[in-house]
Amino acid sequence: MGCLGNQLLIAILLLSVYGIYCTQYVTVFYGVPAWRNATIPLFCATKNRDTWGTTQCLPDNGDYSELALNVTESFDAWENTVTEQAIEDVWQLFETSIKPCVKLSPLCITMRCNKSETDRWGLTKSSTTITTAAPTSAPVSEKIDMVNETSSCIAQNNCTGLEQEQMISCKFTMTGLKRDKTKEYNETWYSTDLVCEQGNSTDNESRCYMNHCNTSVIQESCDKHYWDTIRFRYCAPPGYALLRCNDTNYSGFMPKCSKVVVSSCTRMMETQTSTWFGFNGTRAENRTYIYWHGRDNRTIISLNKYYNLTMKCRRPGNKTVLPVTIMSGLVFHSQPLTDRPKQAWCWFGGKWKDAIKEVKQTIVKHPRYTGTNNTDKINLTAPGGGDPEVTFMWTNCRGEFLYCKMNWFLNWVEDRDVTTQRPKERHRRNYVPCHIRQIINTWHKVGKNVYLPPREGDLTCNSTVTSLIANIDWTDGNQTSITMSAEVAELYRLELGDYKLVEITPIGLAPTDVKRYTTGGTSRNKRGVFVLGFLGFLATAGSAMGAASFRLTAQSRTLLAGIVQQQQQLLGVVKRQQELLRLTVWGTKNLQTRVTAIEKYLEDQAQLNAWGCAFRQVCHTTVPWPNASLTPDWNNDTWQEWERKVDFLEENITALLEEAQIQQEKNMYELQKLNSWDVFGNWFDLASWIKYIQYGIYVVVGVILLRIVIYIVQMLAKLRQGYRPVFSSPPSYFQXTHTQQDPALPTREGKEGDGGEGGGNSSWPWQIEYIHFLIRQLIRLLTWLFSNCRTLLSRAYQILQPILQRLSATLRRIREVLRTELTYLQYGWSYFHEAVQAGWRSATETLAGAWGDLWETLRRGGRWILAIPRRIRQGLELTLL
């Protein structure tokens, strides 16, 4: 039993020590390389110095390097705030640049347009009608018409199959600047911008209306602006970063991308607005790859730049544009034309057939594709029906929007059999005809149309085709259709789909054994911290938590220095452009970016201050770690992985840290209050005397309450003895009540309680006995407390005495064992010391003797060698004698 008791005692002691020294406490780290997804606005930077680039974006210095991270991150091109912002912002650029501000509703009137039988789309000049031959059915041709830079028809705009632009001259009457008088106006329209009714057979005029009058709001550009593409990049505000998946196998969605780089800005991109094709993209490589939507058949196909695919468009004719003031605030841009201009057209250069063949092969190899593997059954098709932007290939050429009919091009690329097609489509050509619209459907807002003024001069534009927008459909492995799409937004998912915006979260929480922050005695390094830039501290994102924690001071300083540096740069360019940015949508975004950066830094510092950890890189707290089974692997886990593990605990830990800090502040307040008593002068302060009076009142009230309680107890005791006092008056007014005892009754020998006195009278001397009674009750209470405490202490001593004796005996035995072991160690050390000394002496003597013998041997050998010539000389002398 004794041994068992000793073991139990030792176990209790060990558990107590473990409970004290092995408890994990929450530790706050500032400057850890961790992040979370963000959705804040980005700002743009561009090198364009034209009107748009100056008013919409900040200057671009081109100094945006990338830093590789040893982490794994998920990327999605469709569920991506960067691409969504690009889609919205490019539309805002488009809308801001043309500044549509005048509604053309007054032009929704009946117009008399020349539409004769001889000239279906006629223009009149001095009662003279310019006519063209009516088109006839062309024979089926298997010839392939090809053009290139040296073709003569390019310069003369007379390539086979191209016609004149379909335009209509109209007249209309409306009130002008003088509201009480009407005026007749002449206007030239593109035929696709009007809707005409069938006129009388004898009348050369038709009733026409401006298109879209009944379906949407039409606005005209206030100033003569044109939509020209610009190149720009997105940049993250200070405190945020852009991650990019650098894996060549990335196809628009990858939950675990292991090749991640970080930067503060994206690559350059172009404000593309086109359907079917993407032009002048920055993602073209020496391979074909596909971004495929995760839940449907939408794709964006990046074409191999090896094939040098180009598209060159031209709008022939030297147009002039004249502003016509129809009424106050409405300036219409007219095209005074005498002849119908040549039709706009585009021709395609490069190895298109090889490129489309590689596209089909890439589709077959894609893991999402389950259709036929026979590329001959994979066809490139045009979408049917819908808006003209869908049916035609819609693109922008220096401010003019072209709608190109792509049948010739598809016949040429696919080598189709054209015998079953309509007469005008029975051709295989590498160029296509286009028509121009001034009233266009906006590609981002449904039900809104914009009137774009015509562009002056002869327009030519050259573009590099870098991608295809398509929907890929297949049925049971028989046929697969690559249907060209009008999803303009897909272009920006290809350009920026490998980026994701993250918010740097430099505050990390982890458990450690230290309960409170203590400063060590080691000296500080006098060398300055090398600032790597804002993203420099993210270089440790792939390092283990322990290794990254050793560099928290440098990382936090780098983070702060980077934020301040970015803010200064951003503020500088904003100040230089504040006049230009004041009234623009993107100017507001740029200013909002700076505000976001300041809010980010202040939010982190406020959070640290709420926990009592302001301006500390490592802050130990008194809050126990809430989940003892969840601890970090400091040698293997990264801070990003650890943040994901403890994300569900963050809210609880934050609340506990705030409560601990509030309690700490209360404790400090109480401690400061106690410190005021050590000054003698504070004892005579007026506020202190008010407290003294308050305490005195409390004492008086307590005495009164005690007297009332004692009175009630005494009355209850009297009632239990059968005595009932008169309650009509208080005890202080009781007089001695004399009662005459009947002499016939026998006298009682004893008393019960405080019964009557001997004799015939009994009285209750309340005022005299009350003080004695109070004293007796207090004495009894103190006696009872003393006896109970003495009994409790004696019993505790009796219980603890054997335990203490056993503990003393155990400690004594441990001391004896330690003393014995120490004696053994001392004896062994002395024996070892003597042995070493004896060995050293023996070795010294042996070496000295050996060295003496060796030296004597060498000396004799040397003398013998030196004596050889002398012996030879002596022998020769004896011989000669």
Curated annotation (Swiss-Prot):
UniProt motif Di-leucine internalization motif: location: 880-881
Location of the motif YXXV motif: 723-726
Annotated GO MF terms: structural molecule activity
Annotated segments matching region V5: 477-484
Region (Disordered): 737-761
Signal peptide: 1-19
UniProt region (MPER), positions on chain: 673-694
Stretches of the chain forming a coiled coil according to its record: 636-668
Site (Cleavage): 527-528
Family annotation (SUPFAM superfamilies): gp120 core, Virus ectodomain
Biological process according to GO: membrane fusion involved in viral entry into host cell; symbiont entry into host cell; virion attachment to host cell
Glycosylation sites: 37, 70, 114, 148, 158, 186, 200, 204, 214, 246, 249, 280, 286, 297, 308, 318, 373, 379, 462, 478, 627, 636, 652
Renumbered residue ranges of the record's region V2: 170-213
Disulfide bonds: 44-57, 101-222, 108-213, 113-170, 235-265, 245-257, 313-346, 397-461, 404-434
S-palmitoyl cysteine lipid sites: 789
Residue numbers spanned by region Immunosuppression: 591-607
Entry annotated with the keyword Coiled coil: yes
Site, as annotated: In-frame UAG termination codon: 736
Record region (V1): 113-169
Residues annotated as transmembrane: 697-717
Modification after translation, per record: Specific enzymatic cleavages in vivo yield mature proteins. Envelope glycoproteins are synthesized as an inactive precursor that is heavily N-glycosylated and processed likely by host cell furin in the Golgi to yield the mature SU and TM proteins. The cleavage site between SU and TM requires the minimal sequence [KR]-X-[KR]-R.
Function: The surface protein gp120 (SU) attaches the virus to the host lymphoid cell by binding to the primary receptor CD4. This interaction induces a structural rearrangement creating a high affinity binding site for a chemokine coreceptor like CCR5. This peculiar 2 stage receptor-interaction strategy allows gp120 to maintain the highly conserved coreceptor-binding site in a cryptic conformation, protected from neutralizing antibodies. These changes are transmitted to the transmembrane protein gp41 and are thought to activate its fusogenic potential by unmasking its fusion peptide.
Additional record remark: This is a macaque isolate.
Name this protein carries in UniProt: Envelope glycoprotein gp160
